[in-house]
Swiss-Prot record:
Family: Belongs to the alkB family.
Binding site residues for Fe cation: 131, 133, 187
Named cofactor requirement(s): Fe(2+)
Transmembrane segments: none
Enzyme nomenclature, EC number: 1.14.11.33
GO annotations of cellular component type: cytoplasm
Positions bound to 2-oxoglutarate: 120-122, 204-210
Catalytic activity from the UniProt record: a methylated nucleobase within DNA + 2-oxoglutarate + O2 = a nucleobase within DNA + formaldehyde + succinate + CO2
Protein name: Alpha-ketoglutarate-dependent dioxygenase AlkB
Residues of the Fe2OG dioxygenase domain: 113-213
UniProt source species: Salmonella typhimurium (strain LT2 / SGSC1412 / ATCC 700720)
Amino acid sequence: MLDLFADEAPWQEPLAPGAVVLRRFAFRAAQSLLDDIGFVASQSPFRQMVTPGGYTMSVAMTNCGALGWTTDRHGYCYAVRDPLTDKPWPALPLSFASVCRQAAIAAGYASFQPDACLINRYAPGAKLSLHQDKDEPDLRAPIVSVSLGVPAVFQFGGLRRSDPIQRILLEHGDIVVWGGESRLFYHGIQPLKAGFHPMTGEFRYNLTFRQAAEKE
């Protein structure tokens, strides 16, 4: 499909205190990001993880960076090795680090130093239920989340699961950054509607950058 807004400059949309949507911020870097997703997946394949409750997640996942987020029947944790390959996770690609760094600065988090990137692949119908990101030791560090491919509806709530939910359509190249007062806000992705993007086919990809190690 022809993108009538391909040359439009990125812009910002405030989401909550400490949170912002950076529209089209990763648009020009998208092909490099997707190429590097392919490389990471060739080393640590996508897989559907099983939660401690025995639920198989609909989203396929892999990781890169010094630490990778994983889950099994014993709980959620960050690990230095991929449990599927028993090898260290692939290094954070330069394209990932560059986009994340620029987005963090644009959102007001210039000191952010990510060491973990969770890569999510959504097929039609895949979703991510409302949750908080609280497995990290330093909750002062923000989250940087990059969207690529088929559009998805991002849900962003508050500190309680019962708080009102904002629903924001995220499109190819959009980035959401949240920290500060909103760092522990509940968030998720509604079931992905069937669609097509010329760079990703039926899929949506998401890169979620976090600081997962203890700062010295």
